[in-house]
Amino acid sequence: MAASKKAVLGPLVGAVDQGTSSTRFLVFNSKTAELLSHHQVEIKQEFPREGWVEQDPKEILHSVYECIEKTCEKLGQLNIDISNIKAIGVSNQRETTVVWDKITGEPLYNAVVWLDLRTQSTVESLSKRIPGNNNFVKSKTGLPLSTYFSAVKLRWLLDNVRKVQKAVEEKRALFGTIDSWLIWSLTGGVNGGVHCTDVTNASRTMLFNIHSLEWDKQLCEFFGIPMEILPNVRSSSEIYGLMKISHSVKAGALEGVPISGCLGDQSAALVGQMCFQIGQAKNTYGTGCFLLCNTGHKCVFSDHGLLTTVAYKLGRDKPVYYALEGSVAIAGAVIRWLRDNLGIIKTSEEIEKLAKEVGTSYGCYFVPAFSGLYAPYWEPSARGIICGLTQFTNKCHIAFAALEAVCFQTREILDAMNRDCGIPLSHLQVDGGMTSNKILMQLQADILYIPVVKPSMPETTALGAAMAAGAAEGVGVWSLEPEDLSAVTMERFEPQINAEESEIRYSTWKKAVMKSMGWVTTQSPESGDPSIFCSLPLGFFIVSSMVMLIGARYISGIP
């Protein structure tokens, strides 16, 4: 029997989408933007201490190999010729920090994840040394001094991990965010791997000047970071190197394919949603929640707690675009917490069913500040709370409150963005794994009181990376000209409650947020000076109140 003929679908482009919770490899038709096949692997997170979040860089890399291999197998089963994959793009969780040995190729410590809080004391120490004025870091980077960004994570590694210190002394250390680690490994690693990053990822390190688009010497000196360990900064769309995978790895089918696109995941989603015009915005619902608004070639600095960041630069000679961003630490992660920590649900999909059973939180409010509060508060002392509980409250109400929390946090960011831009959004474009939850999308429309618009193909983060890779000079299989971009079908969610009810729910949520603040400090419990014991008036009041209560009961003869 003659072998079946492989299908020819026009040039194909692959995309590695490496997120906090999972890794995926997806393949698109560059002429239609159709998703042809993909594979996903969940990634473990480690929590060695309270507030610490780590991942194994080698597990992340092997998950990429596995996803490439399995996706290629699936394409073969569909009779699609994988030799037609002309380029590969990378999108990645931002800020997560890796340091590795360029001689051995081994990571020198686990990846310190963007959610990690161990650097709060480092941040407080650095804030006391800011030269000149408190705007020193933000004016150059668009970012507040926070545990969120890579510079303080790298500073912690240099201060606390002897292997990292030794490798830096011996000129063997390389630093990078996840994109750098993957591109270096996929282009050969110790055998000529390319050590680079793109402008969007560099802009999240707190070491990168978003005006000059270069590593900033003053910032590196302030944080005490040796510049020789930093990756070369490139545009988001150019050929960085060719796939060069070890023969021991089955994913070698794509050997020699150029890696030609790289964007931090939120910038990739902005591109994938085709938000190329000033004022266009998207919100991605993943582990966290990230609302970006394209501000064009101009850096717009927020007065309301938002970040200024690089949106994209789609080619070496192309202009840079900036964005205002609101970041929420915990969105999809709250669903994972309900599943893994509380056991309220067995699968993430169950939460929609539970929420649908009651259709209300019944006055229960959930502030999932597990890693403090990000935009617009930037309050690391906050911690998660569930309040408004009664004897009537059950797991369905808590599930509903968890979904509402994601929507309320988005509302806070959108309000801040409207104040900064002066032009309220008429609708919100959304993407990310959580958008498959129809109750969440309807809640979001109700709480924002504007329509929520969701593309029928939700993989916009990977699509953005694929578009950047396919459009790169020397590849040229994907046109980004407006007239050539494929039309995307959309699902639209209209508000179904009145504006007054929306405002009442939102104002009650704001009260709950205030109650979540001020729960922790960086003061060591070993210092012998914890605040609860320092308050003599409070202690005296509690003891004397108890004495009076006991005395009153005794006098009145109450048993």
Swiss-Prot record:
GO terms for biological process: glycerol catabolic process; glycerol metabolic process; glycerol-3-phosphate biosynthetic process; triglyceride biosynthetic process; triglyceride metabolic process. It is a single-pass membrane protein. Its EC number is 2.7.1.30. Glycerol binds at residues 94-95, 148, 265-266. Its main location: mitochondrion. Potassium and magnesium-dependent. Beta-D-fructose 1,6-bisphosphate binds at residue 252. ATP binds at residues 20-22, 287, 332, 433. Keywords: ATP-binding, Cytoplasm, Disease variant, Glycerol metabolism, Kinase, Membrane, Metal-binding, Mitochondrion, Mitochondrion outer membrane, Nucleotide-binding, Nucleus, Transferase, Transmembrane, Transmembrane helix, Zinc. GO terms for molecular function: ATP binding; glycerol kinase activity; metal ion binding. Optimum pH is 7.7. It catalyses: glycerol + ATP = sn-glycerol 3-phosphate + ADP + H(+). PANTHER family: GLYCEROL KINASE, SUGAR KINASE. It is linked to Glycerol kinase deficiency: A metabolic disorder manifesting as 3 clinically distinct forms: infantile, juvenile, and adult. The infantile form is the most severe and is associated with severe developmental delay and adrenal insufficiency. Patients with the adult form have no symptoms and are often detected fortuitously. GKD results in hyperglycerolemia, a condition characterized by the accumulation of glycerol in the blood and urine. This is Glycerol kinase. It comes from Homo sapiens. The gene is GK.
